[in-house]
Amino acid sequence: IVSLQKSMKAGTKIPGAYLQLMNYEDEKRPDVLYGYPNTLISYPIPGTAVPPWLAEGIAQYMYENADWDHWDTHRDMILRDRAIHDNLLTFTEMNTFGKKGIGNESTYNAGFALTTYIANEYGPESLKGIMEELSSPLQFSVNNAIMNVLGISGEDVYQDFKQAVEARYKRLVVPIEVLPVKGKSVQMDGTANLYPKWHPKKNGFAYLSNKQNDYFGQTDLFYFDLDTYEDKKIKSSVHSAPSWHSNGKMIYYSKKSKFPNKHGSRYYDIYSYDFETEKEDRLTVDARAFNPVFIEMDSSIAYLATFDGGQDIYILDLKTNESQKVTDFRDRPMISNLTYALSSHSLFFDITSHHFRDIYEYSISDESLNKKQDHDLYDERNMTSNEAGLQIFSQDKSGIFNLYMSNPADTSEGYITNVTGGAFMPDISENGKVIYSLFENG
């Protein structure tokens, strides 16, 4: 915001202006003050001419010793994936939003990377100079503004940046491409296929997908039959991971109510869908609830709910339909990806308190809270386990998110994927099959 204010051409009190001209037909009668308008010309003059990539890039770029934001593995994954597939946004494409899938996110990431490149090559003060140049009343071209400050056009700076990025990433993925390990792709429609969950009785899985929709967050709930390759939509506008009932006849998920409450608000709540009756039931009301997990032993559903800027774990008793809050995180961290471990009768979940996610475990039996994967320098997330206690999660220790296996029974552990993009959201069946969401050529 400070940088954008610095680039405004007439200060914050005049964000923009219009040159307008209106003309009217001649009056037809003496009692008519004006004739009918026949000309309307309006020419906008923007008070700010900063493209999205530069605005977002400077917002994310950190001055020396600042630690509010950083170039994380997700940003690196998106830029790397575009670079190795010769699909980097052009300089012109970076200047606008309005893209599908992760296109808008790519504008953010490429902008952060290009801004950092400019700061590293030409000094951090060059960013200030570019914003000051864009504040000039007659300067509306970022290409020319960069030329006036750096002595080289914005397009040429971008081409240098592009060559450096492509050379670096293509060199880094050579060892991975020699021995890739990613399994077999079974569903590639859409730009977001998320949270796959094995059917407990059949050879298939439920998942969320944005196929037939425009944007990443517009996801519907589907069931994919691996025997027939039939793909069926169950419900529209579903949010977060679904969870199967152990009998395979019912599935639980989160979505917003169809109609607003008396205050005009629509919140995420937990719903169930019965495949035999094709009936949907709402299990919570205005709970801001998501990520349900069925617990057969207690005939209950654990879920996450948001309040006061953070999340906590709740357990819904299906016999009484009453919810109980079982955690109370006073520092309001971000909680996500709740899963149930039958072998330990506990809940795994991701927790974010600063830059990285860690994996914690909540014991339903004794209500204790334990750290399972907790490293300061890299990210662990998306824990899943089967009845035998085999644990699989996503980890970015190598700089790329890959699936990592840990077997508490014999203390064996190691990576089970080797991908150039990113491996997330694994789910392991009782017979040891692993299904996950792969980011590749997005």
Question: Where do the PLM segments sit?
Answer:
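Beta/coil-rich, acidic/histidine-enriched accessory regions frequently appended to metallopeptidases
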Residues: 100-105, 130-249, 272-275
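A short beta-strand motif characteristic of beta-propeller blades
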Residues: 181-187, 229-235, 279-284, 322-328, ...
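Blade-terminus and WD-like Trp-Asp/Gly-His loop motifs, strongest in beta-propeller folds
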Residues: 196-204, 242-250, 292-300, 338-346, ...
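Acidic/His/Gly-enriched intrinsically disordered linker/tail segments
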Residues: 3-121, 134-173, 177-179
